């Protein structure tokens, strides 16, 4: 986390807010830790994700020259197609990223192990967390192909941003 903080703190050296923002969004925010989010179940490790999101929020505040309210941060973390700045929050995406990664890897694991699991299941705490985020029951079937499902992404963002459950004030 300290490495990320150090790099983000160097963004102002560029002296071009647009370049700083593009680097923040495209390289230093969620893309920086997406591999970890896909491969590690972070349900019991929310603090580092909150810390990461706080670093990104602080960097955006520095670029804009003003601290962000919780509502402004929620809007900034929406996808650009939904009127946001595309600075996705790690704490929001971690459970779904991990679940979808497990589902995508299952056929490969079955082939490598010579097994054919007819009913693949995800850990119940993971499903419960995702269900709480989107406001409805979640199953392996509803998550299959989720990266292509606009409706699911909409539910994820609507459930999180309209209720402003994340807060994270700074």
Which residues fall in each region the model found?
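Nucleic-acid-interacting cores, centered on viral/eukaryotic replication and modification enzymes
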Residues: 1-170
């Amino acid at each position: 986390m300290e490495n990320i903080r150090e790099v983000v703190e160097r963004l102002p050296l560029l002296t071009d807010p647009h370049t700083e923002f593009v680097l923040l969004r495209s390289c230093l925010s969620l893309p920086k830790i997406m591999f970890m989010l896909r491969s590690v179940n972070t349900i019991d490790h929310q603090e580092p994700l909150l810390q990461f999101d706080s670093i990104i929020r602080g960097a955006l505040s520095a670029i804009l020259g003003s601290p962000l309210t919780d509502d402004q941060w929620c809007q900034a973390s929406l996808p650009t197609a939904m009127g946001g700045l595309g600075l996705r929050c790690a704490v929001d995406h971690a459970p779904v990223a991990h679940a979808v990664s497990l589902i995508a890897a299952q056929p490969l694991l079955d082939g490598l192990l010579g097994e054919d699991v007819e009913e693949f299941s995800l850990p119940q705490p993971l499903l419960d967390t995702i269900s709480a985020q989107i406001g409805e029951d979640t199953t392996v079937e509803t998550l299959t192909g989720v990266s292509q499902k606009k409706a699911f992404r909409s539910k994820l963002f609507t459930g999180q941003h309209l209720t402003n459950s994340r807060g994270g004030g700074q």
